[in-house]
UniProtKB/Swiss-Prot annotation:
This is N-succinylarginine dihydrolase. Its EC number is 3.5.3.23. Catalyzes the hydrolysis of N(2)-succinylarginine into N(2)-succinylornithine, ammonia and CO(2). Substrate binds at residues 19-28, 110, 137-138, 214, 252, 365.
Length: 448
């Protein structure tokens, strides 16, 4: 039976704004308080989805969250009607309103960790929603994330869903942004690579000094257990604390993997050779052969990697066995990075082509092509069991672009978040979206 990897891209929500909420994310902090353009952001994301679909890749879409999150504001003591809750939050504690309006759920690489059926003990695709407990504005996402994923992958015969891990620092889990799967073929058993930034309970592990390590070893181990993964198909690697302190807040900012290829920066990991040896050994036993493509710091610095998001790219397998690298246009604007990419293609290695996309609205908030997608490897039977409403087609693309044009503003400042009309606009848009994507009731305002 044939299998493929499906990229489910996050649809940017109507409240996309530059709140500067993500300490440790250089782009997020440096663009704080600028005016954003939610309409442009959503259309840029949809254009990437359409382009990949046109290239022959199976492409899906993942719905945004309800924002402003009035229910979360009520939990924090704001009372009255929904409009009064927003007005009080704006007057008494504007940072909380900004956090409750974040459109960060567009970066669905953090939505969950996914293990395909070829790796799991019960032969089902397993999903664990990420608790994202390091940042308040993201920690409130996982209940809706779980409902949306449940509506997309509803058939319990093929799909298993786990709630987020306990929302405490010891089990900080950032989802697929710190998880890569290596395999000879998507339908065969592979090796799942979990990258962590620190250990919560074992002081022998190093930790960053400036910025937080968002993923713990304990969280990664818990997800592997929940998914029924054997020790033979799991490798744990530690991210270099020094690069976390340079703004590499997730592993997908310094490395990307697909198939048998790991594309990574020389400074990405601790104990790199030992880690690569374990990956090679376990992948070999699964029938694959690891190809490690290391980018030397002498050619691309960590600073250039963070500025350009070279590694926050999509590495996609083409039918002829070669690979395509999807990068943001910031890579083209960086002479060191673009020079390296030209040499990479010329070297006749696994990466045969680079395609550039304009994702400026997302990039300015700290998220590139890889942040915007959740990868799910599916066989033909499983793909047929996915809610068809979330699989991108030419008609769906047209419907969604028209939906964005109808409902999204072209300018969003901090003051706009306090506009009581914004709540009505967003709920109207999302209510229509759940009908377009055939999700049913997934948002708090639809459930209450």
């Amino acid at each position: 039976m044939k299998s493929c990897e499906v990229n489910f891209d996050g649809l940017v929500g109507p409240t996309h704004n530059y709140g500067g909420l993500s300490y440790g994310n250089v782009a997020s902090q440096s663009n704080s308080q600028q005016c954003s353009n939610p309409r442009e952001a959503a259309l840029q994301g949809l254009a990437k989805m359409k382009a990949l679909m046109d290239m022959g890749f199976t492409q899906g879409v993942l719905a945004p969250q309800e924002r402003p999150d009035v229910a979360s504001l009520r939990q924090l003591g704001f009372t009255g009607s929904d409009e009064q809750v927003i007005e009080k939050a704006a007057r008494q504690d504007m940072p909380l309103l900004v956090a409750s309006c974040s459109a960060s759920s567009m970066w669905v690489a953090n939505a969950a960790t996914v293990s395909p059926s070829a790796d799991t003990a019960d032969g089902r695709v397993h999903f664990t929603a990420a608790n994202l407990n390091c940042k308040y504005h993201r920690s409130i996402e996982h209940p809706t994330t779980s409902r949306v994923l449940g509506a997309m992958f509803a058939d319990a015969k093929h799909f298993a869903h786990h709630p987020a891990l306990p929302s405490v620092a010891q089990f900080g889990d950032e989802g697929a942004a710190n998880h890569t799967r290596f395999c000879q073929d998507y339908g065969q058993a592979g090796v799942e690579f979990f990258v962590f930034g620190r250990s919560a309970f074992d002081t022998r592990y190093a930790a960053p000094q400036k910025y937080p390590a968002r993923q713990t070893l304990e969280a990664s181990r818990a997800v592997a257990r929940l998914h029924g993964l054997s020790d033979e198909c799991v490798v744990y690697g530690q991210q270099n604390p020094a690069v976390i302190d340079q703004g590499v807040f997730h592993n997908d900012v310094i490395a990307v993997g697909n198939g048998e290829v790991l594309f990574y920066h020389e400074d990405a990991f601790l104990h790199t050779e030992q880690m690569l040896g374990e990956l090679r050994d376990k992948l070999s036993r699964a029938g694959g052969q690891l190809q490690a493509v290391c980018v030397p710091r002498a050619e691309v610095s960590v600073q250039d990697a963070v500025r350009s998001y070279l590694f926050n790219s999509q590495l996609l397998s083409r039918p002829d066995g070669s690979m395509l690298l999807i990068v943001p246009q910031e890579c083209q604007a960086n002479a060191n990075v673009w020079g390296y990419l030209q040499r990479l293609i010329a070297d006749a290695g696994p990466v045969a082509e680079v395609k550039v996309f304009d994702l400026k609205q997302s990039m300015q908030n700290g998220g590139g092509p890889a942040c915007l997608r959740l990868r799910v490897a599916l066989n033909e039977t499983e793909l047929a069991a996915v809610n068809p409403g979330v699989i991108m087609t030419a008609p769906l693309y047209e419907t969604l672009t028209q939906w964005v044009d109808r409902h999204y503003r072209d300018r969003m400042s901090e003051n706009d978040l306090a506009d009581p009309r914004l709540l009505t606009e967003c709920r109207t848009a999302l209510d229509e979206l759940t009908q377009i994507l055939k999700l049913g009731a997934v948002y708090p305002f639809q459930l209450n």
